[in-house]
A protein has these predicted regions:
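Structural preference for solvent-exposed beta-strand-turn elements
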Residues: 1-240
Length: 240
């Protein structure tokens, strides 16, 4: 068993958990992937349409050099266990993850299977980079989601010169549109996203600004936290 700082693991799990699938037939998507190298640990969550990845340095080398997939139900229990503690112990026992804090311990079966090549999903370069105000986007999203059609709740982001338009509609009833000033001088471009996916990624960023990167309306959009260079989120846009 290896000592680990509870706050580090807790924050990593929270910032990637929202991207995990719940009952996907592709079982590897139903958990968070943990992989350690030297004194670093990487946590990844994906459901095949979005992805969240976070890296952190840890004082001790953790036993996940081959990579493990921890089920979402186990993640919930681990978070409860480590939430208010400072340090704990973690290890692998056969095909199970073991976590202990003080007198309490938890042992959970891991998900079998090969995790997808998540690095290949993250664009290496993007044509456009735009800084967004977290508050402005959250406010616009909150309103747009009310008007968006269930169950997909599609939100359209249209980038124009120095302007971002946030649109949603529900055929036959409501339509919503709001404009947010942004520093953008690229081509006129519209992207569509599942509203809840956008909302989740905006909430996951701690900074008051969000860096959004994209190359075209059909290419994956990357979201970064300016205050945390080790955090990356990706959302696949919907077809317009």
């Amino acid at each position: 068993l290896v000592d680990f700082p509870c706050f580090t693991l807790s924050s990593m799990l929270k910032k990637t958990f929202y991207s995990v699938a719940v009952e996907d037939t592709r079982y590897v998507f139903n958990g968070i992937y943990l992989k350690s190298t030297d004194n670093k640990i990487t946590a990844v969550g994906t459901d095949g349409r979005r992805l969240a990845k976070l890296e952190r340095e840890v004082p001790n080398k953790l036993p996940f050099t081959k990579g493990v997939i921890v089920p979402h139900k186990a993640i919930r229990e681990i978070l409860k266990l480590i939430e208010s503690a400072s340090d704990g112990k973690i290890g692998l026992i056969e095909n199970q993850i073991y976590v202990s804090v003080n007198e309490n311990a938890l042992q959970c079966k891991l998900i079998d299977g090969a995790y997808p090549d998540y690095e290949s999903v993250i664009p290496k370069e993007s044509k456009y980079k735009v800084k967004l105000s977290k508050d402005a986007v959250q406010t616009a999203l909150r309103q747009a989601l009310i008007a968006a059609e269930e169950p997909i709740k599609q939100i359209r982001l249209t980038f124009e010169t120095n302007l971002l338009r946030v649109n949603s509609s529900n055929p036959g009833s409501t339509e919503f549109s709001v404009s947010i000033p942004v520093a953008y001088d690229g081509e006129h471009l519209t992207m569509a996203f599942k509203g809840d996916y956008l909302n989740d990624v905006i909430k996951s960023v701690d900074d008051q600004e969000i860096l959004m990167e994209f190359s075209s309306s059909g290419a994956p959009a990357v979201f970064r936290d300016p205050s945390d260079v080790n955090y990356t989120a990706v959302i696949m846009p919907m077809k317009l």
